[in-house]
Regions:
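A charged helix-plus-loop insertion that forms the helical arch/lid used to bind
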Residues: 85-99, 171-173
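Residues that line or immediately flank small-molecule/substrate-binding pockets and catalytic motifs
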Residues: 74, 95, 204
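Gly/Ser/Thr-rich active-site cleft segment
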Residues: 9-11, 115-218
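N-terminal glycine/serine-rich phosphate-binding loop of ATP-dependent small-molecule kinases
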Residues: 1-91, 116, 144, 194-199, ...
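Short alpha-helix plus adjacent loop in nuclease-associated cores
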Residues: 95-114
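Short, charged, surface-exposed secondary-structure boundary motifs
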Residues: 38-41, 100-106, 176-178, 210-211
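Generic alpha-helical structural signal
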Residues: 51-55, 59, 100, 104, ...
Length: 218
């Protein structure tokens, strides 16, 4: 019987669960509150704090039980921009109402519902609206942007070094995915970001192995 560590990041709580491969029964669970940091450049999630929690929890599970695989799930409506230095830009809180200030302008850029199946939602619930607002608010982001990954795959990137996007995350009212063509929607072309997105992978694919240095630490 093998052990699977599940990283489960919700908006209000971050959770690590160790489950067995037979029946997926929980063996151990660790949680900590997740909160929005209300400071410049905009309200954002504490990615660094969550990463410390993840590393400590994985190390504890590995020491007590052993880990054979890691799976990641997160809340939706979030995206991570990675700079040329390999570090993440602050990840915008998708409930930030200031995004609505550019709603009319964004409406001219977003792909039609018939292409994406995404309704036009308030605040940053459409990831495309988040991207438009951030790039308009801070144009310098484009100069330093290296790649964009979906939120679950950000944690996979920290674990493995591999950058990827997942079409199930993109397909969740993001305005960025055309499920009929199984390709990015024209919203990304309007935003000039198609080339920035990490390659799309299936959610059941193995992203990679944990980086050797990190594996030794854990």
């Amino acid at each position: 019987m093998s052990h699977i560590a599940v990283i489960d990041i919700g908006k209000t709580n971050a959770k690590l669960a160790l489950v067995n491969s037979v029946g997926l029964h929980e063996i151990a669970v660790i949680t900590q509150p997740n909160h929005v940091v209300d400071s410049p450049p905009w309200p954002h999630f504490d990615l660094a704090g969550i990463w410390v929690f993840i590393q400590n929890g994985l190390a504890q599970f590995q020491k007590q039980y052993g880990i054979d695989a890691i799976s990641v799930t997160t809340h939706g409506a979030s995206i991570v921009l990675i700079g040329q230095n390999g570090e993440a830009f602050p990840m915008l809180d998708y409930e930030y109402s200031a995004v609505n200030s550019l709603s009319d302008n964004y409406a001219q850029l977003r792909a039609d519902f018939s292409q994406t199946g995404s309704p036009h939602l308030p605040n940053g619930l459409n990831i495309g609206a988040q991207l438009h607002w951030m790039l308009t608010t801070d144009p310098m982001i484009r100069k330093h942007l290296a790649s964009i990954v979906t939120y679950p795959q950000y944690w996979g990137y920290l674990l493995t070094g591999e950058r990827a996007s997942d079409f199930t995350s993109l397909g969740c009212h993001s305005d960025l995915w055309n499920p009929y063509a199984r390709d990015f929607a024209t919203t990304l072309d309007a935003l000039g970001l198609r080339s920035c997105f990490a390659p799309v992978r299936r959610p059941d694919e193995i992203l990679g192995e944990v980086k050797p240095a990190l594996a030794q630490k854990l």
